[in-house]
Amino acid sequence: PYIDALLGDIDLDPCSTHQANNQFLRAKRIYTMEDDGLNTEIPWTGKTYLFPPTYGRCSFSQKRGTWKWNMSGLGRSRIPSVVWFNRLEKEWKLRNIPEALFFSTNPEMMRVCPNIWGYPICIPTKRANLVNGRDFYTLPTPFTWGFFIYLPRLDLGFNQADQFKEIFSHLGKIIC
């Protein structure tokens, strides 16, 4: 209900599955792992929700000019959440995306991606009991904390984060 209250109809989820999208988010357009939303040259457009994979590592191939996700994390690899957030932020700054909500359960991102602190963030007081996208099961006890980052609509001027604060303050601490 919080995501819907903030964004309304979602135009894009660049990191999803058909099953999860049909069951929960109902974004108008999604990219699956096979579609490779991270590396697509098609601009991301519209109101966007993004919850990228938080495990494994991403490494950049100079030869291909693309990111590759894997479990090993060899070489100069990066946290997937950071790579996905950077793509989201780029599309938002280009005004392809009017507003976006990013969710991650990787706390390391708070340290290695300082640009997130330029946006309103919600750190919930309770851990999210996440639903596994393949099997639709939840763990009896949530295993990690998560946080939301809001890339706001710019047409609202100085009040751009007010709606986010109003909606998400019921979940936890808002940092602006």
Q: Model-derived features: where do they sit?
A:
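Class I S-adenosyl-L-methionine-dependent methyltransferase catalytic core
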Residues: 1-176
